[in-house]
Amino acid sequence: MSKAVGAIAVGIALVAVAVFVPGVGTAIAGAAFSASAAAGATLSAATLAAIQAGAATLIVATGLTIAANGLQMARAANAISQAQLTRLNVSLDPSAPRKIAFGHTALATDLRASIPTGADQEYHEYVICVASHTVESITEIWFEDRQAWTVGGGIASYYSGYLTTVTVRNPGTNANGIAINSQWPATSTLTGCAYVYLKVKRTGNSKKAESVLPQGIPSRVTIIGKGMKVYDPRLDSTVTGGSGTHRADDQTTWEYSHSGTDIGNNPALQILAYRLGWQINSKLAVGKGMLPERLDLPSFITAANICDEPVTLAIGGTQRRYETHAVFSENDATSSVENALLFACAGRMTDHNGKLGIALAYNDLTGTLYEFDDDDVLGAFDWNPSPSIHETHNIIRGRWTDPSSNSLYQMVDYPAIRITSPDGIDRTLTIDLPVVQDGKRAQRIAKQILQREQYQGTFAAIFGIRAWGVKVGDPVKLTFDTLGFVEKLFRVVQQGI
């Protein structure tokens, strides 16, 4: 072992191994981060996460792991986008920010025109923008809790004669504008955006009849559809590990569904699409607009495959490991958008060799692990086995977005997840999962968070040059006589120069 070239400071965080969650399938907990290294540099901080099988009653076997900073990400992701909260209510706001929609969900309802028409203003016409990009489809419209229109069945009988026109523009172009009057001429096209035009009759169709929409459309309107098409590097033959015609720099090749399977609800691909951004007339409309060459595209292949893995449910059947469905706006901080999606797929962003990528939890403990011992630790160390009991929780409760007709994309509670408190005092953490639209999946994610929080110990020390052989996120073994560690499993969670 050489100590001549450089030193690496290493810190450790305890994590749990895979456990089984009654009723919701397999839960996962752990740690994984990214780092880069250059020969001869000196690292001031690197963090490892320790894995202790059998350390808690929930632990039954070595298995999958996820980010050790999951609790911090959970708190950040708990801030729900205003676009998500307000999308069920139509509002006329000239300064409303652009919206981006992912997955199969309730789309935005930005009212761009609200104009009374007719000789006696017996009609009212509306233009509602659902996304500042092309969407896959717009399939349903609901007024309050009543279905008003479907793409297959047209206008519902209850509204027949009063909801007189429903027209979808996906997207608006110079050739398909809808003329209402001088306030909204045919040249008002919302170019590149997906929108819906509605016309309602506010008076009865006979002397004795009354309109079911005398005040026009209600304030609560739900427009359901499938959102942004995504780029999938698995379908790109120019990317290592990919095969197909998708291209990161050509959004005409992007898809929501491929060969009958939805890919637009895959959180890894949504994050990639958000980073690439969506253009209208060669100008960035939504997203970050990053260049493909700045991205570690093969890492998104791995992450997308993990999201698509089937998880067996205790009640029978399977579901994809991770799916996300959400609406965001350009007013949202880019970090909050990414954190919301990352948190819902046990993910983290990486920066390795100058390229930004993604890493999701998976079982990487079965291969050959890098091993360190006393000779690798160059100086003083800091070992904090666990935080104060007052800083941990034994109960997690919160909400998820229910897409059923009973809730129509409102948030509802998932059953509280709990373990026994060490001192008998319950401490509750509230975690909302607005981008998750399945109750079982929400429970599974909440269980992961609770399990991770039980393993937050940290170890920090200066390591020798051999530590350049690992990168943040790697599991390693550490034998350290001072603390009695013998091939103790750890995971690198932070590394800095």
Where on the chain are the PLM-derived regions?
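Acidic, small/polar-enriched beta strand-loop surface segments
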Residues: 133-138, 146, 371-433
